[in-house]
C-alpha cells in the first residue's frame, strides 16, 4: 500500500458499530496508516475488516474499558508526528484530511484542527462551540473561514502526538462523555488553540450502535453520562449545584426505580437506577478529596 503521507496515523475506537458503517468509514481512509481498538472484543469484525483493508494495528479489548482508555492505548502505539482521532460514524476524504494537516502546520499555537461537519442531507452539523458550563445553546457555527473555538466534539480531531503526550493524554476517569470538553479546557490552559477548519469537510451521520442488550445500553448511557458530567464539573469546581440537585432527587429516583421494576417496566427502572449508582460512585471521589 502506498501511503498518502507518512506523517499521519488515524485511530478509530469501536464499540458494537454496524459493519457497513465501519467499512464506509475505512473505505475513505484506506490509504493512511490505521490503528483500530475495539472495546467490544469483536473477533468476527476484526477478521472481516483485515480481509478487506490493510490495518497497521488492530487491538481487541476483552472488556469495554471506555473511550478514553482505548484512545490512549492507540495514541501510545502511533509512530507518526500527527494523529487523527476519528469516529466510525464520520466520513472524511483524503483531501480533507490533508487540509487538516496543512492548517495545523500553518497556525503556530495550534493543538487541534477539526473539520466542518455536515449531516446526511449535506446540512451544517454541530462540531464546535462553547464549553458546557457556559450554559449556552450549542448553535452550529455558520461562519466562513477558520474559527478558534472553546471546544469540539471528539468525532474528528487532528493533533500532534508530542503535544498530547506533553498534555498527559486523555483523562481516563471519563468513560465516554465530556472528555472532549475536558481535553479542550486543558489545551486552553496551555495557551494552545482549537481550530475548526472551514474548507476541511466531513460527514457526521451519528451512527447507532447495534447493542444486543437494550437494557444494558440504557444503563450504560445514563450511568456514564451522569458520572462523567459530575466528574467534569468537579474538575472545574462547579459541581456543587448539579451534585446537590441530584442528591435531592435520589429518594424519588430510588422509589421510581423500584416501582417501575415491580410494574414490569425494566427500561424505566434501569434509567433511574443508573443515575443513583452514578451518584454514589461519584460521591466516593468527594470523600477522597476531603481526606486529602
Model-derived features with residue positions:
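Short aromatic/hydrophobic "clamp" motif used to bind/position activated sugar donors
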Residues: 83
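Nucleotide-sugar-dependent glycosyltransferase catalytic core
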Residues: 125, 203-228, 240
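Conserved active-site beta-strand element of glycosyltransferases/polysaccharide synthases
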Residues: 158, 176-178, 184, 193-198, ...
